[in-house]
Design a protein with these regions (language model features):
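C-terminal, low-complexity/hydrophilic appendages and adjacent surface loops
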Residues: 86-106, 179-234, 240, 333, ...
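Loop/turn elements at helix/coil->beta-strand transitions in domains of secreted/extracellular proteins
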Residues: 22-28, 172-174, 189-192, 240
Length: 468
């Protein structure tokens, strides 16, 4: 599984350091994660991660029928909330909940034989990921640059951990650190931490709360004595809690944390990153466009659209992917099969598959291959897809349901001339196009009127509120 693969790759790096004689003078910093375990897999878990990311959840009975797929390349599974909570023990909460260590704390191992002589020993000093870069620079004897290419750099808040390499009892040089994600917030200061859970559990995406509401309660912990935040001391030391709350406010102002955002509430404002595409509805792509993130490609979901391509087939025929987006759990692909026959494949959550194929392979010469999709209207609804070759309709079929929000949050992309990720369709990995691709055009055809936008808005909201 994932852990075994990770261990094997780390071993390759360490073996290389040993083989090249660099191991003793190399500082290795191994951090076991980037946050707590994810509870986004919902109450029952998921066979297809894109399904719950789009607000669709498999029934427990269906999951049990497909239990043998878990951990294989047949699915993109995600464990359930209970496992996330267990994996974060002994801490409270999990990923997204930055107010508590279950959401933020990970183990870290350091190795540097030439400089760290107290091997196999534990360090209890409090530190944060922002202290990694200063530690590396200090170890290398370098100063943080004040300018880069003439551009003044922001000040560095991190501190080096080098002082602790050979002194397990040294006092921590990290005195204060704030935390905040989705309104879940905390402040650490000299052995104490004040924590405020904002109210939304991670497995319900869009249930928002106002700040300062009854669902919020600030808690207080002395982590020098209470590593796992198990004893709330807010009623015992109200003055200390008030002191830390004020400190959080000052740190939040200094570090641009305010205004706090609950992205599920309209009242918190629109903090979405502006689209690089603006209001464009049509874009042209070439084989130079591979590994393009989904957000940087024309969004054709929940709308009628057209995917057209101009290709040249060499003597003897061709095969391979013309263009695709997504992966084996959700996406679409326009390609020539191993017989050179134009084919369109639509994949919804790895479960609802539609393949539209022409009857004849393409002969050598120039051709235009187009898929025209007419959307029924509404959030994740279906529609009629028609495949055209050189302007002539060669086949059509209904796609009964479509992906409404996102094809992938796992690194799948838009590609022209190859499928760089997990194959969207029933073809080999990669499957490069063996002819010449001159152009691929994505065009969103239908104008989203007020009623359509309302259906989409309601669909997004309901998808985000579903927890199981």
């Amino acid at each position: 599984g994932f852990l075994a693969h990770t261990d094997a790759q780390i071993k390759r790096i360490l073996d290389c350091l040993n083989e090249t004689g660099c191991a003793d003078n190399t500082l290795v910093i191994y951090i076991t994660g980037d946050n707590g375990a994810s509870a986004e897999g919902t109450v029952h878990g998921a066979w297809s991660a894109p399904s719950f990311q789009n607000g669709v959840h498999e029934d427990p009975e269906w999951l049990l029928e497909h239990i043998d797929d878990f951990g294989t390349n047949k699915c993109e599974n995600h464990f359930n909330v209970g496992w996330a909570w267990a994996l974060d023990a002994p801490f409270q909460w999990m990923k997204q909940v930055a107010s508590h260590f279950g959401g933020t704390r990970n183990a870290m191992v350091m190795k540097w034989p030439d400089r760290i002589t107290e091997v196999n020993s534990v360090r209890n000093q409090f530190h944060h990921v922002i202290d990694i870069a200063p530690t590396i620079l200090a170890a290398a004897g370098l100063k943080w640059p004040e300018t880069v290419n003439g551009i003044e750099q922001m000040p560095v808040d991190g501190v080096s951990m080098e002082y602790s390499f050979n002194d397990a009892d040294a006092l921590s040089t990290r005195k204060t650190q704030y935390f905040e994600i989705f309104g879940n917030r905390a402040i650490f200061h000299e052995g104490w931490i004040a924590s405020c859970f904002h109210g939304r559990v991670p497995w319900i995406r869009l249930k928002g709360y106002e700040f300062g509401g009854d669902q919020e309660k600030w808690e207080l912990y002395n982590i020098d004595k209470d590593f796992s935040q198990s004893e709330d001391l807010s009623d015992t030391y109200p003055e200390k809690l008030s002191e830390l709350q004020n400190l959080f406010d000052s740190e939040a102002v200094k570090n641009n944390v305010f205004p706090l955002r609950d992205t599920s509430l309209r009242i918190s404002g629109n903090f979405r990153v502006p689209s690089a595409l603006g209001k464009r509805k049509r874009m042209s792509y070439t084989t130079a466009h591979v590994r393009i993130p989904e957000s940087a490609v024309i969004n054709i979901k929940n709308a009628s659209h057209r995917i057209s391509s101009k290709v040249t087939i060499p003597s003897g025929g061709a095969q391979g992917v013309i263009a695709c987006q997504g992966g084996n759990m959700s996406g679409w692909s326009l390609y020539l099969d191993n017989h050179g026959i134009p084919t369109y494949h639509y994949n919804c959550f790895g479960q609802y598959l539609t393949t539209i194929r022409a009857e004849d392979p393409l002969v050598d010469g120039d051709h235009e291959i187009t898929i025209d999709y007419q959307h029924d209207g509404g959030f994740g609804a279906g529609g009629l897809a028609t495949l055209y070759v050189d302007g002539e309709s060669v086949n059509s079929d209904r796609i009964e349901r479509t992906v409404p929000i996102i094809f992938s949050m796992s690194g799948e992309t838009f590609d022209v001339g190859i499928d760089t990720g997990a194959p969207v369709g029933p073809y080999p990995h990669g499957y490069p196009f063996s002819g010449e691709i001159h152009e691929v055009v994505l065009e969103r055809m239908s104008r989203r009127d007020r009623e359509t936008r309302k259906k989409m808005k309601d669909g997004f909201k309901q998808a985000g509120l579903r927890s199981q």
